Amino acid sequence: MLGIDIIKNIRIAKALERFGYHFLNRVYTEYEINLCKMNVECLSGRFAAKEASIKAFSFLSIRRFSFRDFEVVKSKNGIPELRIKDAYINDFLKAQKLKPFISISHEKEFSVAVCYITKEERIC
């Protein structure tokens, strides 16, 4: 399952200007708000990652997802990781041996993200 999203960073800047913390709290977790510190590129990348994740997870037909169902965290080595906030979904993924991965990139005024969900397989 695959989801992709691209966003013009100015859209996030305008949403911040117009709606402020109401927008932030509707889309981002406290961790993400603290991590990005109002950096538009950081917030745009996470927005794109959440949109891509919603698209990828929609193929599972479990339920409808929202932005706050997902949290984009930094791994120990700086790679973005997707954290799912719903215990039921985590249990479902574990039972089906599915693992989501995300990638975020920025180019000039755009941020793009991909989420793909793959079967966990042991190698050996």
Swiss-Prot record:
InterPro entries membership: 4-PPantetheinyl_Trfase_dom (IPR008278), 4-PPantetheinyl_Trfase_dom_sf (IPR037143), ACPS (IPR002582), Ppantetheine-prot_Trfase_dom (IPR004568)
SUPFAM superfamilies: 4'-phosphopantetheinyl transferase
One Gene Ontology molecular-function label: holo-[acyl-carrier-protein] synthase activity
Pfam families membership: ACPS (PF01648)
Keyword Lipid metabolism: yes
A biological process term (GO) from this entry: fatty acid biosynthetic process
Keywords: Cytoplasm, Fatty acid biosynthesis, Fatty acid metabolism, Lipid biosynthesis, Lipid metabolism, Magnesium, Metal-binding, Transferase
EC number: 2.7.8.7
Principal location: cytoplasm
Cofactor: Mg(2+)
Annotated catalysed reactions: apo-[ACP] + CoA = holo-[ACP] + adenosine 3',5'-bisphosphate + H(+)
Compartments in which it is found: Cytoplasm
Top-level class of the enzyme under EC nomenclature: transferase
Entry superkingdom: Bacteria
Binding residue positions for Mg(2+): 5, 51
Any one of the GO CC terms: cytoplasm
Stored HAMAP family: AcpS
Protein family membership: Belongs to the P-Pant transferase superfamily. AcpS family.
Function text: Transfers the 4'-phosphopantetheine moiety from coenzyme A to a Ser of acyl-carrier-protein.
Protein name: Holo-[acyl-carrier-protein] synthase
Gene that this sequence comes from: acpS
